[in-house]
């Protein structure tokens, strides 16, 4: 009967045994700096896949793979003695490309960041080739003079309106004075009109 929990526990133990054996027990000169990254055991505890990485170039990886294949029987025997299981799982060694892929991805991200930084610096120092607003027509001296002339005309018109109002007010006051003089000659008292009031008030 499959027992996933037991398979995980056995995988951890196999990883420890194989890593220790590669460090102390295997004397193959082809074996490089090998690191056991993970071990997966099937639920029936029959097969174990050992994932590993090798520090170095492609030649170092190839030589280490050959050394592991040669030492597979020895390593399986040590696993059987260390774990005490009835049937020692077969060992299959697989080069773990995940760290290499992760490093490659980090390198790509680093290159992209450097490129973005250079582009940002270029944009910061860039200046527009033309005017900021190419559709904005600059004002001319003649247009400025026309605006000043229009302002002067408006001021003169306002001054004329004020004089007209003053003249109308003077005519109204003069009419009241004439009425008072005519009334006095006729022996009557004439009162000036007061807006909103009674002209006879105060007699």
Swiss-Prot record:
Keywords: Cytoplasm, Ribosome biogenesis
Acidic residues biased stretches: 142-169
Any one GO molecular-function label of the UniProt entry: ribosomal small subunit binding
Biased composition (Basic and acidic residues): 119-141
Sequence segments annotated as region (Disordered): 119-203
Subcellular location: Cytoplasm
Keyword rRNA processing in annotation: no
GO cellular component: cytosol
Major location category of this protein: cytoplasm
SUPFAM superfamilies (UniProt xref): Ribosome-binding factor A, RbfA (SSF89919)
GO biological process: maturation of SSU-rRNA
InterPro entries in the record: KH_dom-like_a/b, RbfA, RbfA_dom_sf, Ribosome-bd_factorA_CS
Function description: One of several proteins that assist in the late maturation steps of the functional core of the 30S ribosomal subunit. Associates with free 30S ribosomal subunits (but not with 30S subunits that are part of 70S ribosomes or polysomes). Required for efficient processing of 16S rRNA. May interact with the 5'-terminal helix region of 16S rRNA.
Known partners and oligomeric status: Monomer. Binds 30S ribosomal subunits, but not 50S ribosomal subunits or 70S ribosomes.
Family to which this protein belongs: Belongs to the RbfA family.
Protein name as annotated: Ribosome-binding factor A
Species of origin: Frankia alni (strain DSM 45986 / CECT 9034 / ACN14a)
């Amino acid at each position: 009967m499959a027992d996933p929990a037991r398979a995980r526990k056995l995988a951890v133990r196999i990883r420890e045994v194989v890593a220790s054996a590669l460090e102390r027990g295997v004397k193959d000169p082809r074996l490089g700096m090998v690191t056991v990254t993970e071990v997966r055991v099937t639920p029936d505890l029959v097969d174990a896949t050992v994932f590993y990485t090798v520090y170095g170039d492609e030649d170092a990886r190839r030589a280490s793979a050959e050394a592991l294949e040669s030492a597979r029987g020895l390593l399986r025997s040590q696993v059987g003695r260390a774990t005490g299981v009835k049937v020692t799982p077969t060992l299959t060694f697989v080069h773990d490309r995940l760290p290499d892929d992760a490093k490659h991805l980090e390198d790509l991200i680093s290159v992209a960041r450097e490129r973005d930084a250079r582009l940002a610096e270029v944009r910061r120092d860039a200046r527009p080739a033309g005017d900021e607003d190419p559709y904005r027509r600059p004002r001319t001296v003649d247009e400025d003079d026309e605006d000043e002339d229009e302002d002067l005309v408006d001021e003169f018109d306002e001054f004329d309106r004020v004089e007209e109002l003053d003249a109308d007010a003077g005519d109204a006051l003069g009419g009241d004075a004439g009425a008072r003089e005519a009334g006095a000659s006729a022996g009557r008292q004439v009162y000036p009109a007061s807006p909103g009031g009674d002209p006879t008030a105060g007699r």
